[in-house]
């Protein structure tokens, strides 16, 4: 029993829920419940962690913190992490090695985020691609994997500037009254 309490205390520290250990589940917010679930996954020291819809029912800010936490756990504990998630843009907030897209029960794609975002697979499968990728495509740009579209902050946008500028000048915006 002492070992169990030690393990709970340790993972509660990792996911920042130590102050909540005395609370009933009904007293916890959605984000706190997600962190409790993550703690449950961490209790057993396994090499591969599977998170099934870790962003479900979380607002975007809390979802971002959840992805930060998963990323931190992955780095600090040297774990392989598998995330099953429909909110792709939120999951891509941190670095991802590979994305597997499943459609109609079969693997449709298994590639790097850069390769996937440069393709039309997400659209074909009814998955919303990141908004900046959609905007570039609306501007007539052919997004290339070599420009690293996984993160807008680090993407090479130089090849797209002229087309985006031309598109912006052609788009008529409604008058603000």
PLM region spans:
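Conserved ABC ATPase "signature" region
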Residues: 3-20
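Conserved ABC ATPase signature
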Residues: 24-28, 32
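Hydrophobic anchor residue at the start of the ABC signature
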Residues: 38, 84
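Catalytic Walker B motif of ABC-type/P-loop ATPase nucleotide-binding domains
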Residues: 49-52
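Helix N-cap at the start of a conserved alpha-helix in ABC-type nucleotide-binding domains
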Residues: 60-62
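Conserved H-loop
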Residues: 87-94
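Conserved beta-strand-loop-alpha-helix hinge in the C-terminal portion
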Residues: 106-132
């Amino acid at each position: 029993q002492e070992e169990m309490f030690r393990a709970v205390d340790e993972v509660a520290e990792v996911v920042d829920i130590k102050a909540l250990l005395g609370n009933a589940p009904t007293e916890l917010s959605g984000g706190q419940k997600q962190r409790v679930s993550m703690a449950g996954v961490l209790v057993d020291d396994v090499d591969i962690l599977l998170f099934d819809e870790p962003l479900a029912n979380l607002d975007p800010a809390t979802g971002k913190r959840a992805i930060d936490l998963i990323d931190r756990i992955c780095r600090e504990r040297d774990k392989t992490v598998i995330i099953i998630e429909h909110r792709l843009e939120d999951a891509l907030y941190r670095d991802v090695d590979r994305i597997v897209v499943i459609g109609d029960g079969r693997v449709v794609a298994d590639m790097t985020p850069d390769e996937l975002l440069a393709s039309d697979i997400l659209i074909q499968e009814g998955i919303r691609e990141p908004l900046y990728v959609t905007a570039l495509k609306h501007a007539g740009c052919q997004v290339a994997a070599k420009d690293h579209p996984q993160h807008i902050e680090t993407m090479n946008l130089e090849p797209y500037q002229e087309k985006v500028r031309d598109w912006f000048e052609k788009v008529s915006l409604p008058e603000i009254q």
